[in-house]
Curated annotation (Swiss-Prot):
Coiled coil: none annotated. This is DNA polymerase alpha catalytic subunit. The modification Phosphoserine is found at S239, S262, S269, S317. Its main location: nucleus. Residues 83-93, 260-278 have a biased composition (Acidic residues). In embryos, a cleaved form of 130 kDa is produced up to cycle 14 and then disappears. Residues 99-113 have a biased composition (Basic residues). Catalytic subunit of the DNA polymerase alpha complex (also known as the alpha DNA polymerase-primase complex) which plays an essential role in the initiation of DNA synthesis. During the S phase of the cell cycle, the DNA polymerase alpha complex (composed of a catalytic subunit PolA1, an accessory subunit PolA2 and two primase subunits, the catalytic subunit Prim1 and the regulatory subunit Prim2) is recruited to DNA at the replicative forks. The primase subunit of the polymerase alpha complex initiates DNA synthesis by oligomerising short RNA primers on both leading and lagging strands. Gene3D superfamilies: 2.40.50.730, 3.30.70.2820, DNA Polymerase alpha, zinc finger, DNA polymerase family B, C-terminal domain, Palm domain of DNA polymerase, Ribonuclease H-like superfamily/Ribonuclease H. It catalyses: DNA(n) + a 2'-deoxyribonucleoside 5'-triphosphate = DNA(n+1) + diphosphate. The CysA-type zinc finger is required for PCNA-binding.
Length: 1488
């Protein structure tokens, strides 16, 4: 068989003598001996006796539907079976050629004739397929039962399927899947981590149970149904065996009795490619094309009897901790099928009576809206459902463009375009628009009127009054826009507003439609030619005929929607390098109520369709395995084209309102749309609800027009915080699943699972299981109810809310608010002026909002106080302001309408007066806050039903999210309501409030150890929980009485706090339960152990160290335990006890691997490129790449020795080995060192010693770091000895002009004979030389000057060295990237760069030179007497050095910085006139 379905299959050859004919020969030889064939059950008719016409008809049915296109047109039946063709099994080359000539090709067939080919070998040979099967061990005795071929024949004769099943199980042994080893690795890693962290021995029985677990047991536990009570009302459908999609015979059966999801209406096999056909499994076909009514009844009765029979207990019983939802999904399909009767009736009901009269009123629930401003301008499509479940498409036409023409103050001269003295009137504007703009746009008619509007925003290049008269113009929305270029100047029109507003926005604002709601439509027409796939489609020419339904009393709930969850499996085609679909699972619910708690399970119909990857063939035991598979309805197709055609047919019947998927751009919806378009599947637009002919290209969501798309991954990124947002992590964090309850299937595992039929059924179950997890995640996170509430609050569309467009939500909220207040809204920014990032990628936090064109923040963000680093074992009180920025906006009435933009962008605007009317922005926030308070009051009501409780909770969450994100639109540069001056004013008041609160707390004699934007950490110095809360209440009352809207509250109490630096801390958070007992819970922020780009080994060790540091032991015992843990992990790594998965490092690709410019220093990029190239992986932007650092026999850097874990496992001759030194020095050591660096009693060198590393490197780096930190700190102690101060300085060297001997000068004197001392300038160091240095004093002075210049030049060369012990890279250049406030090393990318020669070093060196010539500071007990000439010489050299020192500003000490903390405390006291001292002269800096 060929490797690719696109190549013709080679002819079969009779080369296997031990095959079918050899078996028949053995059967003949056994005839007449004692080994007789005994058939237990007498069979009347083994073969049917028919005439030649009937035989030809049956043979045609058998072969025609399998591989002949167009139902066999052009072919003639030769009345032979395939095994009668001797030429097909001929050994000779000539026989093969003759057989090809005999077969021929029909003239009308589309099949191309086969070319002469050489005998296929290797994987392409059919031998390879059979050789993969596990051979059966032969017995010594020969009997009929032992003959496989005879057993197959008898199995076909017998009617009992059990005998065939038993025999097939003996022939085809189940193969173990490769994912088992990975599961064992994960289990071992999990067990090791638990034992390391908890130090608790696992029970022997549980450990044996974990070791005995396998994929088969897990899937049996998942798939085998529990014993259920029989239910006679269960509706049963077609058998979940493989369906070959035959053409049905025309029967007079009624349409209403057909299964809406049956595949008998269309033959998708005709869409299969010829090369993709596979004929072997046809000999084992289990279903006939047509069945009689009696046979169907018998089948139904047998199924009922089978379902009603009590289930036998299975050995693989599920765990007690398994959730009920999972058991309903995969263990109890009978209860799910119970809902299918209603499902079928509802679907058929919606298809009937879909016509509607134009005289009637149409009332429907609007879900989604769509417009195409290019192809259909001025039109909007609304999609929804009626109360009886019919899908509706409303086409609204004639939505006019609305322009607001701002008049100039004076008319412009038509020629010079300079202002004249003539004032502009509304008539002037009308005339210019009629004569110039209307003619240019070719307007046949337009309407205009004079209106008074307000404008409160900033327009670039023009000055717009806050309120004035405008000319409002309405014209056909299909006409183009007026000329808005900057070069175009109108004589009377200063600016045209509203030109960029699209039809959908105008329609929603004019009709006051805020999200999904009930709409009532009158005056419509039924479309004669439908443009949609909905049950009901009407066209409306008057937009005003769309009205909101005003119900008296409680509003009517929304109708149930139809939900469809999709999960797609893909494989890479190595020839085309494209992802091809090989499996699609579908879960659907046709009555999913969004305003009620989600049903359990969240679907009432399920099915799965599959085809084979291009590089594999169907396994021989597939039909047998699928006959036993009862977990879902499976549809098998022989090509991707047939699969997608079937999918579109089912998709259209379901007519879903909501599509649920996970990471739609990752081989899910994108692959479906790409392959449907690429394969040219007819009517591809059925993916959406509009009948379209042209694809949208890369605009994925527009293929699903009219249907909401819920991407669970994207919604989870907005709803929760997680280490990663892949499906495995979300299932573990949200659904509380265990590692054994989900299996990840990668590309390699997928191909291996297609080798056996049993593995394919497992793959189907895993695909269905993942699909059910998507629905559970959507329901657990309340994605749809929350999106509905947010959309109703903001007034945008559901699709944009589900896509995470936070900026657009706020934009529509303000659009509705300003429109209701008769304001002109700002124009949309052109797309060309925006960055490529969408709303979901934009930072909307406000404090971090930056212009991408600028290198620094456009305005100052939130205030972050300098932390007092250390370990706090007394209780620390955490307090924060509730919704600080929204409260500031309300407190100071900050709005577009109340605050004027300053002329200078760097200046802060002035706050409005207290008598100013509240602005629109504060009013909207007040409405949101008060609404949330009212909802929370309703939640506190007793006897509240679960449905109302859920609705109130989701409502208050939506109000909170909307209010907290309102500030974001002010600071987001690409927002339509961007107002930098307002955002800067809000953050300025936030910094001011935090500073005032800090000072107030300090006045109460409490230390604020840290503060960040809206929170404070206060050290109480006590360990009484209740007393700490009393202190918090006192602080709260003192602060809150200063403000009206701002509210400071207690956020928690830390029993122990490890404060490392800004935004990095760990703490034990205390809380009391209902019984008054204290509960301890760890809280981490910014630490390495919460980041995913560290290995699990480093994270595990870091957590163990953190547990010890935050424990209640004394500090010495903590450090001893930490050191013991490190020595233990060092030993276990050396012994190979640590499981391999713990060494895996995970990093995310921020772009496509090919787009990285310098991938050599990025290990995850190297691994992604290599795996994509060599192992057919599909790593792309946003994916997480796992790798390990190995020793590969090269001298490359560690970052260039990264390999995937699979590469390490499959390495030949153990060429790859783990680099344990890398993990000790680059993973464990830095993580632990950063945690304990603030503790006294340990340091980096001690940690290195515990890990078996060289501690000297870390001591040197610690000294360098200490020197730099000492240099940067202004308060270094000056009480040092001369030896301590100048121990690293170099002595002064000069050369004698006579003997050329180098003179070494460490002080003014050098030792002489008999313990005496001699002045250095008095005598040459060489005793034979008679020339004293004082005689060439000028030369000595010049050499001193040159020496000082060398030291200065050395400093300005700015040589840097990496502080990482394994790097020590020297360089003079550095990047702007910082690490710990120092430049990042570009070589290792893990260390920071330190100066080799710092300002402190230079200053000490110069001071040392000056000290040499200062005779008064020499500490000799008996100083020699010097002549006046020598004293003057020393004084001259002293002044030379001192003059150099005076030119340096390093000698100036800033007392304001030195005593900053003391001055801050003094500022809190009543001000007293004090002398201001800024600096002191250099003389004080020289005190020793």
């Amino acid at each position: 068989m060929s490797e690719s379905p696109s190549e013709p299959r080679a002819k079969r050859q009779r080369v296997d003598k031990n095959g079918r004919f050899a078996a028949m020969e053995r059967l003949r030889q056994l005839k007449g001996t004692k080994n007789k064939c005994k058939v237990e059950d007498q069979v009347d008719d083994v073969y049917d006796v028919v005439d030649e016409r009937e035989y030809a008809k049956r043979a045609q049915e058998k072969y025609g539907d399998d591989w002949i296109e167009e139902d066999g047109t052009g072919y003639a039946e030769d009345l032979r079976d395939f095994f009668e063709d001797e030429d097909e099994y001929s050994d000779g080359e000539e026989d093969r050629k003759d057989s090809k000539k005999k077969k021929g090709v029909a003239p009308n067939s589309k099949k191309r004739p086969r070319e002469n080919e050489k005998p296929v070998t290797g994987k392409a040979s059919i031998k390879n397929l059979f050789s993969n099967a596990v051979p059966k061990k032969m017995d010594v005795k020969t009997s009929v039962k032992d003959d496989d071929i005879l057993a197959d024949i008898l199995g076909e004769i017998k009617e009992e399927p059990a005998a065939t099943s038993e025999k097939a199980e003996k022939v085809i042994a189940p193969a173990k899947i490769s994912v088992t080893s990975r599961k064992f690795d994960a289990a071992a890693a999990k067990e090791y981590m638990n034992s390391f962290l908890n130090n608790i021995k696992v029970q022997e029985q549980e450990r044996k149970k974990a070791e005995a677990s396998s994929d088969n047991e897990m899937l049996e536990r998942i798939l085998k149904p529990k014993a259920a009570v029989p239910n006679t009302k269960v509706a049963f459908f077609s058998s979940p065996t493989i369906k070959k999609e035959p053409m049905p015979e025309k029967t007079p059966a009624k349409k209403a009795t057909e299964d809406p999801f049956s595949d008998n209406e269309m033959d998708f096999s005709c869409l299969d490619d010829d090369e993709n056909q596979f004929d072997v499994e046809k000999t084992q076909q289990t279903e006939k094309v047509s069945q009689t009514k009696t046979a169907a009844e018998k089948t139904s009765q047998s199924k009922v009897a089978e379902k009603s029979a009590p289930k036998k207990e299975t050995t693989g019983s599920p765990k007690e901790s398994e959730s009920e939802d999972i058991s309903r999904l995969l263990n109890n399909w009978e209860s799910i099928c119970q809902m299918d009767d209603d499902f079928e009736k509802s679907v058929l009901t919606t298809e009937q009576d879909s016509t509607i009269s134009s005289d009637q009123q149409l009332r429907f629930w609007y879900w989604e809206a769509y417009e195409d401003p290019v192809k259909m301008p001025g039109e909007v499509f609304l999609f929804g459902r009626t109360a009886d479940g019919k899908s509706v498409c409303l086409r609204v036409q004639n939505i006019n463009r609305v322009l607001y023409l701002l008049p100039r103050q004076f008319l412009l001269d038509p020629i010079s375009k300079e202002p004249t003295k003539q004032k502009v009137t509304v008539a002037d504007i009308y005339k210019e628009f009629d004569s110039e703009v209307a003619n240019q746009l070719k307007l046949e008619f337009f309407r205009s009127r004079k209106v008074t509007k307000s404008f409160a925003h900033h327009a670039i290049g023009i000055e717009v009054p806050q309120s004035c008269d405008y000319l409002e113009v309405h014209y056909d929305g299909k006409k183009p826009l007026p000329n808005l270029s900057a070069d175009k100047k109108y004589n009377s029109i200063a600016h045209i507003f509203g030109a960029t507003t699209n039809a959908l926005e105008r329609f929603l604002l004019d009709r006051k439609i805020k999200g999904p709601c009930w709409l009532q439509v009158t005056g419509f027409k039924v479309s004669p030619t439908p443009m949609s796939w909905c049950n009901t489609e009407v066209t409306l020419t008057e937009p005003k005929n769309v009205e909101l339904v005003q119900d008296k009393g409680k509003p009517a709930p929304p109708p149930p929607l139809t939900l469809l969850s999709l999960n797609v499996r893909t494989s890479m085609n190595p020839k085309t390098s494209r992802n091809e679909i090989c499996m699609i699972s579908m879960l659907t619910h046709n009555r999913f109520h969004i305003d009620r708690p989600a049903p359990q399970p969240a679907f009432n119909r399920h099915m799965c369709a599959l085809t084979r990857p291009a590089v594999v063939s169907w396994p021989l035991d597939l039909n047998f395995e699928m006959a036993k598979y009862k977990s879902t309805t499976v549809h098998k197709h022989d090509s991707e084209r047939a699969l997608l055609s079937w999918f579109l047919a089912q998709y259209q019947k379901i007519d879903a309102d909501l599509i649920v998927t996970f990471d739609s751009m990752d081989c899910q919806l994108n692959v479906i749309t790409d392959q449907i378009v690429a394969l040219k599947i007819p009517q591809w637009s059925r993916m959406g609800r509009l009948r379209l002919s042209q694809s949208f290209g890369k605009r994925l969501l527009e293929h699903f027009v009219g249907r909401m798309v819920c991407d669970v991954k994207r919604s989870a990124e907005e709803c929760i915080r997680a280490r990663s947002y892949d499906l495995q992590t979300l299932c573990k964090q949200v659904l509380k699943l265990k590692e054994s309850e989900r299996m990840e299937v990668n590309a390699d595992d997928l191909l291996e699972m297609y080798e056996k039929g049993e593995s394919i059924t497992k793959l189907i179950s895993l695909t269905m299981q993942d699909n059910s997890y998507l629905l559970r995640l959507m329901c657990e996170l309340n994605i749809m109810p929350l999106a509905l509430q947010i959309t109703n609050i903001c007034g945008n569309t559901m699709t944009r809310t589900l896509q995470g467009g936070r900026s657009e939500r706020n934009e529509f909220l303000l659009l509705h608010a300003f429109h209701e207040k008769n304001y002109i809204v700002p124009d949309k920014k052109p797309v060309s002026k925006r960055s490529g990032a969408g709303d979901t990628d934009a930072t909307l936090s406000g404090a971090d909002a930056t212009m991408q064109t600028k290198k620094k923040a456009a305005y100052a963000g939130g205030l972050v106080l300098e932390p007092m680093r250390g370990l706090y074992e007394k209780y620390v009180l955490l307090m924060d302001f509730n919704s600080l920025y929204p409260s500031i906006i309300q407190e100071y009435n900050i709005c577009f309408t109340t605050v004027q933009q300053p002329v200078d962008a760097d200046e802060l605007p002035t706050l409005p007066d207290s008598k100013t009317e509240p602005g629109i922005l504060p009013l909207q926030l007040k409405r949101l806050v008060e609404s949330r308070k009212e909802v929370k009051k309703l939640m506190a009501a007793p006897d509240l039903s679960p449905e109302l409780q859920m609705q109130y909770h989701i409502r208050q969450m939506a109000l909170k999210l909307t209010a907290n994100s309102m500030y974001g639109c002010l600071g987001f540069a690409h927002s339509r309501f961007f107002a930098q001056h307002l955002a800067a004013l809000v953050t300025h008041k936030g910094r001011e409030i935090l500073t005032n609160t800090q000072q107030l707390v300090q006045k109460m004699n409490y230390d604020v150890v840290y503060g960040d934007t809206d929170s404070l950490m206060i050290n109480t110095n006590i360990t009484d929980y209740d007393q700490v809360y009393k202190i918090g209440h006192n602080i709260k009352q003192s602060v809150n009485k200063l403000y009206k809207q701002l509210e400071l509250d207690i956020d928690g109490v830390f029993g122990c706090l490890l404060l490392l630096k800004k935004k990095k801390y760990a703490a034990i958070k205390l809380s009391k339960d209902s019984k008054g007992n204290l509960r301890r819970e760890q809280e981490h922020k910014g630490l390495d152990i919460v980041r995913r780009d560290w290995s699990q080994l480093a994270v595990m060790v870091g957590k163990a160290v953190l547990d010890e540091v935050l424990s209640e032991k004394p500090l010495e015992e903590k450090l001893d335990a930490v050191h013991a843990q490190l020595e233990k992990i060092k030993t276990q790594i050396a012994e190979g006890v640590v499981p391999l998965p713990l060494f895996v490092i995970t990093k995310q690709l921020t772009r496509t691997p090919q787009e990285y410019a310098n991938s050599a220093s990025l290990p995850h990029v190297q691994v992604a490129l290599r795996m994509n190239r060599e192992r057919n992986r599909r790593y792309k932007k946003g994916d997480m790449v796992d790798y390990v650092i190995c020793l590969d026999g090269t001298t490359n850097a560690a970052m260039q020795r990264a390999y995937h874990l699979d590469e390490l496992k499959t390495s030949e001759d153990k060429k790859l080995q783990l680099d344990t030194n890398y993990y000790l020095g680059h993973q464990i050591h830095p993580v632990v060192t950063r945690m304990v660096e603030v503790l006294e009693g340990t340091d980096a060198s001690r940690i290195a010693e515990c890990l078996g590393m060289d501690p000297t490197k870390f001591r040197q780096n610690a000294q360098r770091t200490q020197r730099e930190n000492t240099e940067q700190s202004e308060g270094e102690s000056l009480l040092k000895t001369t030896l301590q101060l100048y121990r690293l300085c170099e002595p002064f060297r000069f050369q004698c002009v006579t003997c050329k001997t180098e003179q070494l000068m460490a002080s003014a004197y050098r030792p002489g004979p008999s313990n005496s001392h001699i002045a250095v300038l008095q005598q040459c160091a060489k005793s034979e030389c008679q020339t004293a240095p004082i005689q060439y004093l000028a030369s000595v002075r010049n050499q001193l000057q040159l020496s000082m210049r060398q030291y200065v030049q050395r400093f300005y060369k700015n040589w840097l060295v990496c502080d990482h012990p394994d790097c020590n890279f020297n360089t003079r250049t550095h990047s702007l990237r910082k690490k710990s406030h120092r430049p990042l090393c570009q070589k290792c990318r893990s260390g920071s760069l330190l100066r080799q020669y710092t300002e402190r070093d230079l200053y000490n060196q110069l001071c040392y030179l000056r000290f040499m010539f200062d005779l008064g500071k020499q500490t000799l007990q008996q100083k020699p007497t010097l002549t006046p000439e020598l004293e003057q010489a020393y004084q001259l050299l002293y002044e030379t050095v001192d003059q150099q020192l005076q030119s340096s500003s390093y000698v100036i000490i800033s007392l304001s910085k030195l005593f900053a903390r003391s001055l801050a405390q003094m500022s809190l006291q009543p001000s007293v006139a004090q002398p201001q001292i800024e600096a002191i002269p250099s003389a004080l800096a020289d005190v020793v």
